[in-house]
Amino acid sequence: MVRPYPLIYFLFLPLGACFPLLDRREPTDAMGGLGAGERWADLAMGPRPHSVWGSSRWLRASQPQALLVIARGLQTSGREHAGCRFRFGRQDEGSEATGFLPAAGEKTSGPLGNLAEELNGYSRKKGGFSFRFGRR
């Protein structure tokens, strides 16, 4: 007597139904030019979403300045009242506008460098980290 095993039928499903399709586009050359199979019309459509098995391209932040705005918003939202306040190291106590302007002998960095300094509390001007816990 043969008993039907419905679980076995799942093993016979095509792999395309179980896993997402592979990224079958041809790779570009080392200098970032067009691949042999890509057309200008395909490039005009913009980047395509990649599957899990596709190429491992990291998504880049489209507007790094937005990260700075988010960091400022997090500082002023409700974390000040929690007893732990992080002070932006490049910012003087009395002036709000001088936080992103470099001083005379200071190196200038991009917005991501400023964000790293603000989130980590690192200050090149003062030569180290500065954290404040509690109230002023």
Swiss-Prot record:
Residues annotated with Pyrrolidone carboxylic acid modification: 91
Tissues expressed in: Expressed widely in the brain with highest expression levels in the cerebellum, medulla, pituitary, retina, vestibular nucleus, and white matter. Also expressed in the bladder, colon, coronary artery, parathyroid gland, prostate, testis, and thyroid.
Subcellular location: Secreted
Signal peptide: 1-18
Listed GO biological process terms: grooming behavior; locomotory behavior; neuropeptide signaling pathway; positive regulation of blood pressure; regulation of feeding behavior
Keywords linked to the UniProt accession: Amidation, Neuropeptide, Pyrrolidone carboxylic acid, Secreted, Signal
InterPro entries hit by this protein: P518
Propeptide residue intervals: 19-90
GO molecular function: neuropeptide hormone activity; orexigenic neuropeptide QRFP receptor binding
Phenylalanine amide sites (modified residues): 133
A family per Pfam: RFamide_26RFa
GO cellular component, one term: extracellular region
Main location: secreted
Top-rank lineage group of the source organism: Eukaryota
Function: Stimulates feeding behavior, metabolic rate and locomotor activity and increases blood pressure. May have orexigenic activity. May promote aldosterone secretion by the adrenal gland.
Family membership: Belongs to the RFamide neuropeptide family.
Subunit organization: Ligand for the G-protein coupled receptor QRFPR/GPR103.
The protein's name in its UniProt record: Orexigenic neuropeptide QRFP
Organism: Homo sapiens
Lineage of source species: Eukaryota, Metazoa, Chordata, Craniata, Vertebrata
Gene: QRFP
